[in-house]
């Protein structure tokens, strides 16, 4: 029998079962767990290759074939790290398995035909599009920045560069909700809006949900009192929508215990749960141990570095409309920035107590760095803490598959579950919207090669349009055809509440995008956070700010150097 070396095989068809590769310039190594393709029957497109008429391409009608096949891709997702062909049809993931022509090939689960386009996935990593669940919609240019980084869904609120939006992720009231949903039609991004949750009567909250909000945001700048928390969660329970909260840094209306009591065991998404982004000082971090709390971080504190503390003060003053000439404003800002809790946040992410990472875009966060900073945190923890249980440390140096699954879940499946959109997005699974990102391994997490929205390429790193081939410089990110015209409306989703969809807001507002209702937000709990469901008992020393979780002191050194940084951004 003819044989081929592993190296030659990997160069031709991509790595296979047992092969290992490094993610970007991090210390993270992954190993392929399974290969769904069949040796000797692999399909590949090109001159003299397999996907040709009567060979790997069948004669079947389009109804029996996929619209797109991504060949020999390496899928990295919360459920596995596997090699497979991926079939897309009707804007969704139709199959993960073996592509080809079933008339002449065995084991084919993805039929390729004359109506099939090919994307070469050999040597490429495929992930689900990222979900950023903490967006201040301050400027529409954020959307392009996020898309080009590999984010395909943005959840948050705002109305543009208004003072309220600088500080809070809120689209307040039915009028603004309608206008912002109309604006969402213009962008190749899945978008869900949060209304203002700060009210002590249910009426003003219900009308925002009925106008299209997928959830409500409680923010201390609007007054996050126990009464407002209770009212907001009552509306959420009645409408199957999520609540996100930025708690009371100054402890004016009560301490963290009062806030937890106001939750009454009901599900809630706690933003920047460490506290530098805002929340009960100094111990908001302890809520990550509650069964009903779904905790996330924002990316300025990801990971803890020698520069983290210095940059936060100025960010805070600007974002929260504070005056540096007022001593109380300075004290407010300084109370939120604690090296001890930021260091503990790194470890709580690594142990799976913090479940999500988001941006806090232009409001103490960088919209294009959710994915980068997630993997920088994973690298730092691997370097400082070694292998996680479940990741082997063998003669070959071991791999980090479990750690990688834990961290990829933080910006894909877990925010999807939290906000009731996991039936549509959040993972590379059959039936889901085909929001996929392709990466060269050396650029993983930093610079994607292709971004697909609803099964069509929406953005790509593309060379000079006047060149004779696609690759000559200048190569930079450019919008592609899924970002244009009517294709944009069919390749991206706008998420709304069930009440709004039933009320026919699509027709009433004149919306062109496909609308999808959120669901299941009130039954999700910490135990549902994939690979990130630890519920430790956390205490914070009020004088030293030292954090202890289940009796273990959580502390680590700040990073002085990180991967995925200047090496990739020289120009």
From Swiss-Prot:
Its cofactor is Ni cation. The keyword Cell inner membrane does not apply. Residues 129-571 form the Urease domain. The active site is at residue 320. It comes from the Bacteria. GO terms for biological process: urea catabolic process. PANTHER family: UREASE (PTHR43440:SF1). NCBIfam families: PRK13206.1, PRK13207.1, urease_alph. This is Urease subunit alpha. It comes from Cupriavidus necator (strain ATCC 17699 / DSM 428 / KCTC 22496 / NCIMB 10442 / H16 / Stanier 337) (Ralstonia eutropha). The lineage of its organism: Bacteria, Pseudomonadati, Pseudomonadota, Betaproteobacteria, Burkholderiales. The gene is ureC.
């Amino acid at each position: 029998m003819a044989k081929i070396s592993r190296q030659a095989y990997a160069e031709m068809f991509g790595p296979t079962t047992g092969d290992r590769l490094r993610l970007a310039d991090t210390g993270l190594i992954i190993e392929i767990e399974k290969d769904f393709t069949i040796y000797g029957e692999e399909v590949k497109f090109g001159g003299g290759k397999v996907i040709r008429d009567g060979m790997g391409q069948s004669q079947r009608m389009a109804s029996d074939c996929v619209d797109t096949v991504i060949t020999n891709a390496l899928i990295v997702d919360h459920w596995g790290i596997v090699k497979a062909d991926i079939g897309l049809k009707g804007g969704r993931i139709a199959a993960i398995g073996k592509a080809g022509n079933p008339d002449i090939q065995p084991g084919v689960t993805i039929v390729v035909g004359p109506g099939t386009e090919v994307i070469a996935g050999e040597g490429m990593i495929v992930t689900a599009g990222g979900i950023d669940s903490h967006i201040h919609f301050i400027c529409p240019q954020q959307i392009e920045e996020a898309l080009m980084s590999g984010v395909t869904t943005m959840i948050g609120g705002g109305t543009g560069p208004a003072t309220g939006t600088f500080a809070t992720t809120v689209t307040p009231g039915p009028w603004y909700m309608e206008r912002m949903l109309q604006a969402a039609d213009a962008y190749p991004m899945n978008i869900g809006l949060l209304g203002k949750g700060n009210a002590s009567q249910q009426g003003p909250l219900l009308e925002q949900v009925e106008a299209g909000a997928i959830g409500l945001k409680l923010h201390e700048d609007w007054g996050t009192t126990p009464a407002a928390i209770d009212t907001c969660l009552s509306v959420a329970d009645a409408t199957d929508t999520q609540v996100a909260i930025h708690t009371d840094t100054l402890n004016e209306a009560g301490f963290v215990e009062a806030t937890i009591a106001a939750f009454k065991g009901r599900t809630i998404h706690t933003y920047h749960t460490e506290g530098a982004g805002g929340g009960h000082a100094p111990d908001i971090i302890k809520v990550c141990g509650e069964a009903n709390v779904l905790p996330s971080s924002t990316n300025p504190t990801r990971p803890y570095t020698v520069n983290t503390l210095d940059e936060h003060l100025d960010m805070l003053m600007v974002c929260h409309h504070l005056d540096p000439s007022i001593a109380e404003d300075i004290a407010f800002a300084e109370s939120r920035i604690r090296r001890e809790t930021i260091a503990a946040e790194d470890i709580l992410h690594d142990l799976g107590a913090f479940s999500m990472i988001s941006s806090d875009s232009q409001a103490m966060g960088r919209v294009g760095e959710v994915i980068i900073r997630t993997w920088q945190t994973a690298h730092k923890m691997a370097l400082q803490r070694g292998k996680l249980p479940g990741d082997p440390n063998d003669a070959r140096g071991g791999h980090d598959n479990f750690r990688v699954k834990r961290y990829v879940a933080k910006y894909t499946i877990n925010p999807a579950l939290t906000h009731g959109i996991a039936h549509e997005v959040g993972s590379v699974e059959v039936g889901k919207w085909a929001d996929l990102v392709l990466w060269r391994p050396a650029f993983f997490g930093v610079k994607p090669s292709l971004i697909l929205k609803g099964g069509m390429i929406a953005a790509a790193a593309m060379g000079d349009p006047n060149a004779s081939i696609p690759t000559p410089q200048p190569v930079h990110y450019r919008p592609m055809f899924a970002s244009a015209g009517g294709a944009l409306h069919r390749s991206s989703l706008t998420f709304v509440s069930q009440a709004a969809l039933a009320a026919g807001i699509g027709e009433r507002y004149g919306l062109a995008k496909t609308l999808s209702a959120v669901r299941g937000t009130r039954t999700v709990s910490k135990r549902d956070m994939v690979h990130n469901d630890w519920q430790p008992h956390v205490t914070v020393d009020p004088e030293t700010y030292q954090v202890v979780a289940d009796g273990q002191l959580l502390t680590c050194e700040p990073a002085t150097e990180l991967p995925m940084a200047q090496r990739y951004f020289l120009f």
